[in-house]
């Protein structure tokens, strides 16, 4: 199954997957407002050999079939300070 992938102009790392290009009827209005005007990234074959980088193809496929869309949230921000402190404690 092909799906269309869009990125959010408002939130870096947020992506929206829909069954057909430019078909956003299944996406709730409030979510569309938060997401902003979708910027087309590409078409992707969820049943193909390639895997998505941050999400499971099957999970995306199931959500699209059930809800009409899949929303990929940005990864949590790295806490570099906490990582630095943890490394310093390990070195002492």
UniProtKB/Swiss-Prot annotation:
InterPro entries: YcgL-like_sf, YcgL_dom
Pfam families: YcgL (PF05166)
Protein name (Swiss-Prot/TrEMBL): YcgL domain-containing protein HAPS_0171
Superkingdom: Bacteria
Domain YcgL: 1-85
């Amino acid at each position: 199954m092909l799906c269309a992938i869009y990125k959010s102009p408002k939130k870096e790392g947020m992506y929206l997957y829909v069954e057909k290009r430019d078909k956003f009827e299944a996406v709730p209005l409030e979510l569309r407002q938060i997401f902003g005007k979708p910027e087309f990234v590409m078409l992707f074959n969820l049943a193909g050999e390639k895997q998505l980088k941050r999400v499971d193809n099957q999970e995306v496929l199931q959500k699209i079939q059930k809800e009409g869309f899949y929303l990929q949230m940005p990864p949590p921000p790295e806490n570099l300070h906490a990582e630095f402190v943890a490394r310093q404690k390990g070195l002492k």
